[in-house]
């Protein structure tokens, strides 16, 4: 099996190294094309207004000045002599749950693979803070990842469906199991912070916040909150099918 890896945290991210070790439990034919710098929050964006520059680290590892979507396209269309059988994106430092999947470069890497007709899976891992220091239990993904990946690769999926996997922020021993979930709903508390540069001109930072919201049973949020690994099948068809007939009647 030939596997292509990417992420949005960048070529030097610990999560990418973890994912490569997990992938190598399945195959030795593993390739990596990942962003040169952190591309978190770039979602499914393409670099169309400037050229892509790629740095070859070795025969199987490449760093690209581009987005995760760019990386998948370059890997499949340029770097590899034949397409991969599987695309894995991650392991992201921080979960990608509910509405956050629309912002996630990690999820977008798997989305692009699916658009190219290749089975794709996104992996993310929760973190906690200890005295304002981010603590990521990477061993949770590394210990549980191989067996889970083998099962997911063996599962039958329809065309246009990819998987979004999230590990909880606990040790491997504390994980209660794996649940197949639906996408939850977040209430964002986005805000804009204005600052001034040395010449007095304003510049701005977008700040993510979270407002209290009800977590529905069976969702990715509920699984992570309760200490389970969440596996959410997502698809590319964004049509609101339940509304079509009603809308057609309104327009008749």
Curated annotation (Swiss-Prot):
Residues recorded as binding a divalent metal cation, renumbered to this chain, are 8-9, 40, 92
| Pfam families named among the record's database cross-references | SurE
**Protein name per its UniProtKB record:** 5'-nucleotidase SurE
Which SUPFAM superfamilies does the UniProt record give? SurE-like
Q: Which organism is it from?
A: Chelativorans sp. (strain BNC1)
Per the entry, the cofactor note is:
Binds 1 divalent metal cation per subunit.
Any one Gene Ontology MF annotation carried by this entry is: exopolyphosphatase activity
Which InterPro entries did the record assign?
SurE, SurE-like_Pase/nucleotidase, SurE-like_sf
């Amino acid at each position: 099996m030939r596997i292509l890896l990417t992420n949005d945290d960048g070529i030097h991210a610990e999560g990418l190294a973890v994912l490569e070790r997990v992938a190598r439990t399945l195959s030795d034919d593993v390739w990596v094309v990942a962003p040169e710098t952190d591309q978190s929050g770039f979602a499914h964006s393409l670099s169309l207004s400037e050229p892509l520059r790629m740095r070859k680290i070795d025969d199987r590892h490449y760093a690209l000045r581009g987005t995760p979507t760019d990386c998948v396209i370059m890997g499949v269309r340029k770097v590899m002599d034949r397409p991969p059988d599987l695309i894995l994106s991650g392991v992201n430092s921080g979960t990608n749950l509910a509405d956050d999947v629309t912002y996630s470069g990690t999820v977008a890497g798997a989305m692009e693979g699916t658009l190219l007709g290749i089975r794709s899976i996104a992996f993310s891992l929760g973190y906690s803070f200890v005295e304002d220091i981010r603590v990521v239990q990477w061993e949770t993904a590394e210990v549980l990842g191989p067996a889970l990946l083998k099962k997911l690769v063996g599962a039958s999926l329809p065309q246009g469906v990819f998987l979004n996997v999230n590990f909880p922020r606990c040790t491997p021993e504390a994980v209660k199991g794996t649940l197949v979930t639906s996408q939850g709903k977040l209430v964002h508390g986005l805000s804009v912070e204005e600052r001034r540069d040395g010449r007095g001109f304003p510049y701005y930072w977008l700040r993510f916040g979270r407002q209290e919201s009800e977590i529905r049973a069976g969702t990715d949020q509920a699984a992570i909150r309760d200490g389970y690994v969440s596996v959410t099948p997502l698809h590319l068809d964004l049509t609101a099918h339940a509304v079509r007939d009603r809308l057609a009647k309104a327009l008749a």
